[in-house]
Amino acid sequence: MAPHDPGSLTTLVPWAAALLLALGVERALALPEICTQCPGSVQNLSKVAFYCKTTRELMLHARCCLNQKGTILGLDLQNCSLEDPGPNFHQAHTTVIIDLQANPLKGDLANTFRGFTQLQTLILPQHVNCPGGINAWNTITSYIDNQICQGQKNLCNNTGDPEMCPENGSCVPDGPGLLQCVCADGFHGYKCMRQGSFSLLMFFGILGATTLSVSILLWATQRRKAKTS
């Protein structure tokens, strides 16, 4: 058996440490921007931390609770001095729980949560209403310093209006208090009345012809102005 060279181990250890550091940095850089929008990390006693620690295969990174695929399931932006959730907020549309308490939020948040169909717990400052109101949540509980919206309702099951969507469309939830009508397979256009696949070739052909016509018109106008000046 060949003698073991201690020098090779000395060389290997720093290399392995550098590799682990590089992988850690790469993972940190791969975090969605919303997770690092606010300095610090998820507070240990927050509901987001409790959800993440009591659900298997979830982990806390910065302000997010992620699964092993990197999908955001929890977001804790409490006490971040936010007047609005910010342009990256929709990166968290897969969340089950969000904490926004202790922020000076302003304006109506109704459309802020469009697409957040999995959201089940939303913690807001006490002065901010739950998006969609009582019709969008099973329970709304107000406390001295926050308001908790719990159990997002499926408005498509609660509207009681079968004529809300056209004949060839169906109702689909689109976030708290929001819904949309989606055309059935094979239908598209206004009120889902057009049948057959949407022709991209025709669309881009019309778009190209229109753009060309406008360009020629502008060019001719500029030449006319140049001649008269």
Swiss-Prot record:
| GO MF entry, a single one | xenobiotic transmembrane transporter activity
Q: What is its main location?
A: nucleus
Q: Output the Gene Ontology cellular-component terms.
A: intracellular membrane-bounded organelle; lysosomal membrane; nuclear envelope; perinuclear region of cytoplasm; plasma membrane
Q: Which residues cross the membrane?
A: 200-220
The segments annotated as topological domain Cytoplasmic are 221-229
Q: Which PROSITE patterns match?
A: EGF_1, EGF_2, EGF_3
Q: Provide Extracellular-side residue ranges.
A: 31-199
Alphabetical GO biological process terms = cell differentiation; negative regulation of osteoblast proliferation; negative regulation of protein catabolic process; positive regulation of bone mineralization; positive regulation of osteoblast differentiation; regulation of gene expression; xenobiotic transmembrane transport
Sorted UniProt keywords: Cell membrane, Differentiation, Disulfide bond, EGF-like domain, Glycoprotein, Lysosome, Membrane, Nucleus, Signal, Transmembrane, Transmembrane helix
Its subcellular locations are:
Nucleus envelope; Cell membrane; Lysosome membrane
Glycosylation sites recorded in the entry for this protein: N44, N79, N157, N168
Q: Which residues form the EGF-like domain?
A: 152-193
Task: Please list the tissues where expression of this protein has been recorded.
Answer: Weakly expressed in hematopoietic cell lines.
Q: How does it assemble?
A: Interacts with NELL1; the interaction promotes osteoblastic differentiation and mineralization. Interacts with SLC37A3; the interaction is direct and both proteins are mutually dependent for their stability.
Question: PANTHER family this protein is in?
Answer: ALL-TRANS RETINOIC ACID-INDUCED DIFFERENTIATION FACTOR
Biological role stated in the UniProt entry: Promotes osteoblast cell differentiation and terminal mineralization. Plays a role in inducing the cell cycle arrest via inhibiting CCND1 expression in all-trans-retinoic acid (ATRA) signal pathway. In osteoclasts, forms a transporter complex with ATRAID for nitrogen-containing-bisphophonates (N-BPs) required for releasing N-BP molecules that have trafficked to lysosomes through fluid-phase endocytosis into the cytosol.
Please give the name of this protein: All-trans retinoic acid-induced differentiation factor
Q: What organism does the UniProt record list as the source?
A: Homo sapiens
Native organism taxonomy: Eukaryota, Metazoa, Chordata, Craniata, Vertebrata
Gene name linked to the record: ATRAID
